[in-house]
From Swiss-Prot:
Its EC number is 2.1.1.-. This is Methionine synthase. GO terms for molecular function: 5-methyltetrahydropteroyltriglutamate-homocysteine S-methyltransferase activity; zinc ion binding. HAMAP family: MetE. One of its GO terms (biological process) is methionine biosynthetic process. Gene3D superfamilies: 3.20.20.210. Pathway: Amino-acid biosynthesis; L-methionine biosynthesis via de novo pathway. Binds 1 zinc ion per subunit. The keyword Electron transport does not apply. SUPFAM superfamilies: UROD/MetE-like. Transmembrane segments: none annotated. InterPro entries: Met_Synth_C/arc, MetE_arc, UROD/MetE-like_sf. The gene is metE. It comes from Thermoplasma volcanium (strain ATCC 51530 / DSM 4299 / JCM 9571 / NBRC 15438 / GSS1). Keywords: Amino-acid biosynthesis, Metal-binding, Methionine biosynthesis, Methyltransferase, Transferase, Zinc.
Length: 344
């Protein structure tokens, strides 16, 4: 793997020509036309910033990470709106019967992005634990059973993508990111996280990463790394950090627990990579290149192999304007290049 690969996590603010019409036209030819146009426009932004991996083009086909797959699942109905973050809302579903896919969640999006860029792409998909945690359960016996049922249908989705990937990959490896923001919200349910995530990726031959953000305690996750069949972890750190310059512990409080990640990783025969959140997606402040450089250098003082470190925003950038999101990504790429020069 190359050193300090730069990547987007997933979402990016939609252009107004799509966002203002999204719910009115979803499922129509007009939606397809505008989603494709928005994807092309966003891929151009990502490519112009110099990103190594352009993700799925900013998730232009998806309104929200829970609602998008939930709308495509039989046995689940919606009751009303629930606030998630930054005054953003999603429709919370209730599972009232055995759940099954109505059709693919993401195949049309994956096929279009794959043919629209030559860059590596990474396909985010909301994980089984988060789907379970963000749903009401009015059918299954308990939370573990429901999580495993979500894992079953996510596994079906991933196997469909995997089966078609050789025909659209243009020689690129398949990269899948399981989005699990709910991972550590219930510390006593980490067994459910491990069981359901592993079930969801069973039989999938790809580079598999897990994205978690705004965790109460990442150590709960780090302790289970040996049990998870995951290749790497794309995590949020900058939101809990200062904006002071420097590579001392006191200047980089948000990155302290990477030391524990490294301890766990060093005990493994097959090392995991870590995608480090070096820009905060919940503020408009555009991190100066020097600040991002210091965050990267701090991490490399802990994890000595730069090929085990990827760089990304904390989370998806959909909460920021497109211009601010673009500048955050651009500064991240410049910082990466400067650090590589320093360590070469």
């Amino acid at each position: 793997m190359a050193a300090l690969i730069t990547q987007e996590i997933g979402s990016f603010r939609k252009p107004e020509y799509l966002s203002m019409e999204f719910h009115k036209i979803e499922g129509t030819e007009k939606f397809k036309e505008l989603a494709e146009r928005a994807t092309i426009d966003t891929l151009k932004i990502f490519e112009n910033t110099g990103l190594d991996n352009v993700g799925i083009g900013g998730e232009m086909y998806r309104w929200e990470m829970y609602e998008h797959p939930a709308e495509r699942i039989k046995g689940l109905i919606f009751y009303g709106m629930v606030r998630s973050f930054d005054n953003r809302y999603y429709r919370k579903g209730s599972v009232i019967d055995k759940i099954e896919r109505r059709g693919s969640f993401h195949m049309d999006e994956v096929e279009f992005v794959a043919k629209s860029t030559k860059k590596p792409i990474k396909i985010p998909i909301t994980g089984p634990y988060t789907m379970m945690d963000w749903s009401f359960n009015d059918h299954y016996n308990d939370r573990h059973e429901l999580a495993m049922e979500f894992a079953r249908i996510i596994n079906e989705e991933l196997k469909e993508i995997q089966s078609k990937w050789p025909y659209i990959s243009n020689g690129r490896k398949l990269e899948i990111q399981i989005d699990e923001p709910a991972t550590t919200t219930h510390p006593d349910e980490m067994d459910i996280v491990v069981d359901s995530v592993n079930k969801s990726i069973e039989g999938i031959d790809a580079e598999l990463s897990l994205h978690v953000c705004y965790s109460r305690d990442y150590r709960l996750l780090y302790d289970r790394i040996p049990e998870l069949n995951i290749d790497g972890y794309n995590l949020e750190y900058s939101n809990r950090d200062t904006t002071d310059l420097g590579v001392e512990d006191a200047k980089r409080p948000g990155f302290q627990d990477i030391k524990y990640f490294n301890e766990v990783n060093e005990s493994l025969q097959r090392k995991k990579f870590i995608g480090v959140g070096v820009t905060d997606v919940h503020i408009d402040f555009i991190e100066p290149v020097k600040l991002i450089e210091d965050r990267i250098k701090y991490v490399l003082n802990i994890i000595k192999d730069p090929e085990l470190v990827k760089l990304n925003p904390d989370c998806g950038l959909r909460t920021r304007s497109r211009s601010i999101g673009e500048q955050k990504l651009r500064n991240m790429v410049i910082a990466k290049n400067n650090v590589l020069k320093d360590i070469s």
